[in-house]
């Protein structure tokens, strides 16, 4: 046996020991590079909208749970707002309740909103909190109704009929936030816990509203003056006309991108959510690819984040 392959009492070879040391040195270098970022975000609140492929892929969801636990461990205060569209659709199909969508929003009657609340607040919410708990942190699942977190009203939308006349759309119990009371989030975060929020709100008369998770996350990020709103999506971020990722936009540049058509389709409401978040108090918002493992850590703790950052004025 050559010297490079000689065995040590523990059973490893010289090559094994060298590789182990190299890997350890690489990990140490990564930690050292992250130190300035750890200092930058210590004590800050980061709101994460969790959904899309990152939520249904086991490997990505487990990595997400560990990443959020790590954020809390290093002094960041994460607040998670999750979606659950596929899980809602599956339950409605199982119950033989048909779904109708208008502009990507599920028309929600009184019976359906009960099912949606059951799935979001009762099932998905606890699954997401469980991922974080399994990673060693302490997460608590709540809905927007708890502690009066999200007060909502019926979402107002209009459309034009075949004759060109504008008419109001009745989306049922689809809501939009009118007020965010973050005290329950502060109480949980201040006690060392990680809030995990199901996007369900309560109306002035006590009625329940189904709220788009992006919209809920943006409203919460603004209300808590989050340092970052991280929007996990199934796309790399905002792309230019050539298909290249745009790493950063000012709010004005983002608005011009929408007006010019560079930002189009399903990216428009995501960018508008980011704009509303930074307008109402968040320092910056990031649309990033949740299909990339450890996307949140890469965005916060490296120079080259994997998404598009939108800053306020």
From Swiss-Prot:
It is an enzyme of class 2 (transferase). The record marks 49, 270 as: Transition state stabilizer. Pathway: Amino-acid biosynthesis; L-arginine biosynthesis; N(2)-acetyl-L-ornithine from L-glutamate: step 2/4. It is found in: Cytoplasm. It catalyses: N-acetyl-L-glutamate + ATP = N-acetyl-L-glutamyl 5-phosphate + ADP. It comes from the Bacteria. Keywords: Amino-acid biosynthesis, Arginine biosynthesis, ATP-binding, Cytoplasm, Kinase, Nucleotide-binding, Transferase. This is Acetylglutamate kinase. InterPro entries: AceGlu_kinase-like_sf, AcgluKinase_fam, ArgB, Asp/Glu/Uridylate_kinase, Glu/AcGlu_kinase, NAGK-C. Its main location: cytoplasm. GO terms for biological process: arginine biosynthetic process via ornithine; L-arginine biosynthetic process. Its EC number is 2.7.2.8. Pfam families: AA_kinase. SUPFAM superfamilies: Carbamate kinase-like (SSF53633). GO terms for molecular function: acetylglutamate kinase activity; ATP binding.
């Amino acid at each position: 046996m050559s010297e490079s392959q000689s065995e040590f009492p523990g059973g490893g070879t010289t090559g094994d020991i060298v590789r182990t040391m190299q890997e350890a040195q690489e990990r140490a270098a990564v930690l050292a590079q992250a130190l300035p970022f750890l200092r930058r975000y210590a004590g800050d609140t980061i709101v994460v909208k969790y959904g899309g492929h990152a939520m249904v892929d086991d490997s990505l969801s487990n990595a997400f749970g560990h990443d959020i636990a790590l954020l809390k461990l290093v002094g960041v205060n994460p607040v998670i707002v999750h979606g659950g569209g596929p899980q809602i659709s599956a339950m409605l199909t199982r119950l033989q309740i048909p779904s109708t969508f208008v502009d990507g929003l599920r028309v929600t009657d009184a019976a359906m909103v009960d099912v949606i609340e059951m799935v979001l607040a009762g099932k998905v919410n606890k699954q997401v909190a469980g991922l974080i708990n399994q990673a060693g942190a302490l997460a608590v699942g709540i809905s927007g109704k708890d502690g009066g977190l999200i007060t909502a009203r019926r979402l107002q939308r209009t459309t034009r009929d075949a004759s060109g006349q504008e008419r109001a759309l009745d989306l049922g119990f689809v809501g939009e936030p009118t007020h965010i009371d973050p005290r329950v989030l502060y109480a949980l975060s201040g006690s060392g816990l990680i809030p995990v929020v199901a996007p369900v709100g309560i109306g002035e008369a006590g009625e329940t509203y189904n709220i788009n998770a992006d919209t809920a996350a943006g409203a919460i990020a603004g209300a808590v003056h989050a340092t970052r709103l991280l929007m996990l999506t199934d796309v790399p971020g905002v792309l230019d006309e050539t298909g290249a990722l745009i790493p950063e936009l000012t709010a004005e540049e983002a608005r011009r991108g929408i007006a010019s058509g560079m930002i189009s389709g399903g990216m428009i409401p995501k960018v508008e959510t980011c704009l509303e978040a930074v307008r109402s108090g968040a320092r910056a918002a990031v649309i990033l690819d949740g299909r990339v493992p450890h996307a949140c850590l890469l965005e916060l703790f490296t120079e080259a984040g994997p998404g598009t950052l939108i800053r306020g004025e």
